[in-house]
Structure formats: C-alpha cells, structure tokens
Curated annotation (Swiss-Prot):
Keyword Cell division: no
Name this polypeptide is given: Small ribosomal subunit protein bS21
PANTHER family registered for this protein in UniProt: MITOCHONDRIAL 28S RIBOSOMAL PROTEIN S21 (PTHR21109), SMALL RIBOSOMAL SUBUNIT PROTEIN BS21 (PTHR21109:SF22)
Lineage: Bacteria, Pseudomonadati, Thermodesulfobacteriota, Desulfovibrionia, Desulfovibrionales
GO biological process, one term: translation
Organism: Desulfovibrio desulfuricans (strain ATCC 27774 / DSM 6949 / MB)
InterPro entries recorded: Ribosomal_bS21, Ribosomal_bS21_CS, Ribosomal_bS21_sf
Length: 67
C-alpha cells in the first residue's frame, strides 16, 4: 500500500502529494478500483479480453505492413 511520510524538517506538501500520486499510479490502485466499481459477468470479461487481443493483433499486423 503506497504511503508517503513527511519529516518536520522538509515539510513540502506539493512534493509529497506528487510522490504519493506516483506510487498510487505505479501500484495500479485507481485502475483496479475502476475495474471493480461494478460487477462484470465472466462472459463479458471473456468477451472484452478476446476483443482486446484481436485489437492488439490487428495493430501488430498494421505495424508489420507499414515497415
């Protein structure tokens, strides 16, 4: 779990907030929260996963044709 501790000597809230946001982003907490906000049926999850794989494949094919 991300956390930022401040000393009394170097109390700069902006830097601490920036550091905290970076840690949260790296841990993937916000994306996980958005994903779990509503229940998604397993069939819908499989369908989305399959569509994403197809999209990646098409992108890869397009990239190969351009080069």
């Amino acid at each position: 779990m991300p956390g930022v501790f401040l000393n009394e000597d170097d109390y700069n809230f902006d830097i601490a907030l920036r550091r905290f946001k970076k840690q949260v982003e790296k841990a993937g907490i916000l994306s996980e929260m958005k994903k779990r906000q509503h229940y998604e049926k397993p069939s819908v999850m499989r369908k989305k996963k399959k569509a994403a794989a197809r999209k990646r494949l098409m992108k890869k094919i397009r990239k190969m044709n351009m080069a």
